[in-house]
């Protein structure tokens, strides 16, 4: 296809060259008259046979229409193009040869001009041409003479440039011609009009070439291109820039006066006049300067030395003593360490302004209280005094900023009110060196207690401890080492040794050790008194260490591992090792005062083990009577006696029971443990988390003024060695709390859960609790390995399995049947 097209284009060029070189042949028409096309062809043949008169005139066969009009004086339509905004007009020729103006249009109306460029007869002029007195149609075509006055408007008289255009009819003009011809009195049917229209089309159409060749179409396109090469879109855009529709808006804008705000001021006009004046500068040569005043030549010599100090003017540099110093914006560093504890305290926001003096590297910081909690106070920028040079400060470096932040923290820590620091002390036969039996390759780091700061920091709600359920895993905090869960002990209850040393495993104790625990609890309740501030308390103070609080986690979890084992008969304070998670847990490290349990011949060491203990600063939650579902545990709150006052301790327990005695029942019945595991061969320690899960569900009873809660934690699992874990706490409170029981499930590894049930005689009654100091007592603990079945004792059980005590001391009394 492309090859055929290329051949057709080559043939077109050859035909054009041959037609221009050879002489055309003359044609003879059989008709008497000749058409307009035939007349033009005859002139073309005639011009091609002539020799050029002027050597520069290479072609004479052009402008055939002008030659035809001059030769035959044919009537034509006249179009005048006037200069400027006068527009253009259309004029018809009269019979006497004069022209009458018919239509005058502005240049903005380009419809008629577009038809002239396309060499087509405009349909709008059909009626005007039909009414003309002179017939200007020639074989259905109209000859238009265009007179352009725009190029020679300055001449007198104004001249013009003339050219002729042949307008050919179109289908839009032939249809009105058919109607015009059939207007006479005769009636023309539609069948008669069709032959008339066909004859008009054939008469006005140009000759057709029916040669089936692509070269014919290519030749026609090339001829049309040569005729319309100046009518392309880019050329029209360039010509329209200088046409009147485009120039007119520019002239109108230049003729209009500028707005008042854009007028040049008078001073500016004077400057323009000065600039416009010519300035004559006569630069003479050096040495030819003449002093016009004295009339003698002036020799200008360059001085060898110039006293600069006399001629120059110096400016003093800005120093630190200059009072006019720039005001530096105060740079604020927000202290991320915020302290808050109890409800009702005012929140403070520490924002030290880090500024450094010019004279010395002293730093100053500011601590401003906030107006509202959890909102930053707006501070006015620091302004130096003009007369006070010591107040001239500048922004410090990052090192100074860090130093200022540390100073601000120290100032806050020194001014806040919190518990004092007190280290754990130990006396008696117990020694801290005995912790070696509990050491593991990966010991958890001891966690210091973060003390509450009254009046500083953010306000947090009282945290509550949720102990994990019996799933064998601890939800938060570091798990105890495997060797703690199954530490090899020589025997569970040493009789005379001050501490338990690492040795081979021993058989489990007998069930008769349970009464020792009950009796020891009664004796501790009767004989133990609240410690005073002047004496060394049985509960040591918390060692406070301020740490950065965790964002968004007000609840902190703690684990307390038993560190040493002591005999019942020993005296003095005992130390405990406190272990907990990394994130600022609050741990209660207590030393216990041993009490000899009546009725038991063997002492029992004790320790504290918990996986979810936490001190809380909130009030005791109110509880309403009624059954509560086991899935929604209720909190159990204790109070710890410290030099600063009572500290709340909240225990959140999942599911279970622990029955506390009513107000009139003074004794607890401790269920004896049955089906104890027999001593087995020593096995290597099995890994497993060590801890306890406390649970509480309330059902309409209130705690008495003072009760004893004996917690006996037993481990389960084959091959696991017994460990002493017990805590005897004195329940204190100041609100009515329903009481039903506390279940203490304990899990070691993935073995079944042994449960210990403390059940009193059911005497429900509600009384008001009175706030009293907390006593933490160490009692003999019975530990057994293996599955434990919980059985409610019969009233006829031996008296050694019953726990009897009084709230305010006294001798133990047997429980009611």
UniProtKB/Swiss-Prot annotation:
GO CC terms: extracellular space; SAGA complex
Q: Which InterPro entries match?
A: Spt20 (IPR021950), Spt20-like_SEP (IPR046468)
Stretches of Low complexity bias are at: 469-479, 494-505, 513-531, 598-618
Molecular functions (GO terms): transcription coregulator activity
Q: Please report which protein family the annotation says this sequence is part of.
A: Belongs to the SPT20 family.
Query: What is the recorded name of this protein?
Result: Transcription factor SPT20 homolog-like 2
GO biological process, any: regulation of transcription by RNA polymerase II
Q: List the disulfide bonds.
A: none
Its signal peptide is none
């Amino acid at each position: 296809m492309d090859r055929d097209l290329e051949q057709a284009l080559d043939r077109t060029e050859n035909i054009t060259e041959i037609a221009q070189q050879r002489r055309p042949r003359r044609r003879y028409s059989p008709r008497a008259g000749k058409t307009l096309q035939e007349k033009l062809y005859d002139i073309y043949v005639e011009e091609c046979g002539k020799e050029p008169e002027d050597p520069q005139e290479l072609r004479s066969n052009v402008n055939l229409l002008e030659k035809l009009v001059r030769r035959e004086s044919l009537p034509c339509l006249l179009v005048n193009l006037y200069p400027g905004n006068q527009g253009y007009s259309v004029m018809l020729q009269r019979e006497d040869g004069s022209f009458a103006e018919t239509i005058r249009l502005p240049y903005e109306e380009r419809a008629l001009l577009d038809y002239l460029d396309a060499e087509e007869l405009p349909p709008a002029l059909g009626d005007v041409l039909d009414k003309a007195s002179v017939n200007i149609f020639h074989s259905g075509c109209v000859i238009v003479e265009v007179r352009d006055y725009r190029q020679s408007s300055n001449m007198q008289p104004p001249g013009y440039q003339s050219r002729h255009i042949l307008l050919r009819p179109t289908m839009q003009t032939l249809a009105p011609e058919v109607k015009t011809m059939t207007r006479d009195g005769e009636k023309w049917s539609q069948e008669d009009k069709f032959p008339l229209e066909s004859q008009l089309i054939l008469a006005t159409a140009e000759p057709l070439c029916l040669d089936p060749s692509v070269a014919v179409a290519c030749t026609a396109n090339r001829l049309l291109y040569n005729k319309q090469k100046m009518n392309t879109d880019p050329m029209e855009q360039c010509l329209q820039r200088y046409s009147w529709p485009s120039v007119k808006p520019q002239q109108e804008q230049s003729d209009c006066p500028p707005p008042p705000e854009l007028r040049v001021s008078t001073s500016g006009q004077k400057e323009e006049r000065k600039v416009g004046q010519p300035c004559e500068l006569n630069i003479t040569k050096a040495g030819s300067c003449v002093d016009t005043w004295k009339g003698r030549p002036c020799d200008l010599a360059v001085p060898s030395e110039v006293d600069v100090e006399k001629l120059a003017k110096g400016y003093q540099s800005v120093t630190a003593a200059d009072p006019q110093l720039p005001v530096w914006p105060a740079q604020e560093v927000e202290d991320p360490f915020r302290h808050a504890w109890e409800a009702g305290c005012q929140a403070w926001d520490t924002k030290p302004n880090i500024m450094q003096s010019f004279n010395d590297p002293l730093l100053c910081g500011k601590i401003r209280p906030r107006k509202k909690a959890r909102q930053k106070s707006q501070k006015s920028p620091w302004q130096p005094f003009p007369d006070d040079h010591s107040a001239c400060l500048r922004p410090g470096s990052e090192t100074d900023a860090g130093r200022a932040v540390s100073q601000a923290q120290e100032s806050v820590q020194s001014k806040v009110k919190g518990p004092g620091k007190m280290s754990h002390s130990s006396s008696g036969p117990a020694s801290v060196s005995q912790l070696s039996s509990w050491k593991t390759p990966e010991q958890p780091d001891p966690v210091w207690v973060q003390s509450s700061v009254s009046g500083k920091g953010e306000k947090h709600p009282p945290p509550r401890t949720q102990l994990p359920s019996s799933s064998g895993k601890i939800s938060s905090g570091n798990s105890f080492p495997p060797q703690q869960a199954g530490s090899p002990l020589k025997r569970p209850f040493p009789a005379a040794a001050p501490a338990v040393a690492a040795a081979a495993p021993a058989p489990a104790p007998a069930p008769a050790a349970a009464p020792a625990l009950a009796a020891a609890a009664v004796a501790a309740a009767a004989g133990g008194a609240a410690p005073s501030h002047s004496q060394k308390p049985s509960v040591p103070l918390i060692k406070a260490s301020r740490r950065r609080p965790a964002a968004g986690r007000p609840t902190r979890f703690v684990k307390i591992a038993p560190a040493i084992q002591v005999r019942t008969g020993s005296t003095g304070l005992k130390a405990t090792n406190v272990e907990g998670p990394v994130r600022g847990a609050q741990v209660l490290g207590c030393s216990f005062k041993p009490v000899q349990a009546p009725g038991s011949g063997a002492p029992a060491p004790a320790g504290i083990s918990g996986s979810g203990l936490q001190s809380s600063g909130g009030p005791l939650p109110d509880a309403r009577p009624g059954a509560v579902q086991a899935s929604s545990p209720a909190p159990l709150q204790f109070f710890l006696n410290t030099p600063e006052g009572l500290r709340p301790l909240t225990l959140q327990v999942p599911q279970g029971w622990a029955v506390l005695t009513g107000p009139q029942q003074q004794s607890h019945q401790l269920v004896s443990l049955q089906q104890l595991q027999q001593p087995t061969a020593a096995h290597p320690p099995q890994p497993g988390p060590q801890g306890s899960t406390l649970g509480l569900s309330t059902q309409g009873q209130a705690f008495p003024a003072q009760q004893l809660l004996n917690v006996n934690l037993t481990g389960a699992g084959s091959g696991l060695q017994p460990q002493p874990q017990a805590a005897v706490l004195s329940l204190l409170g100041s609100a009515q709390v329903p009481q039903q029981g506390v279940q203490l499930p304990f899990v070691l590894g993935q073995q079944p859960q042994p449960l210990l049930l403390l059940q009193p005689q059911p005497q429900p009654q509600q009384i008001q609790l009175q706030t009293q100091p907390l006593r933490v007592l160490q009692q003999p603990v019975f530990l057994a390995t293996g599955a434990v079945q919980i059985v409610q004792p019969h009233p006829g059980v031996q008296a050694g399995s019953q726990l009897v005590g009084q709230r305010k001391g006294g001798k133990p009394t047997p429980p009611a049947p």
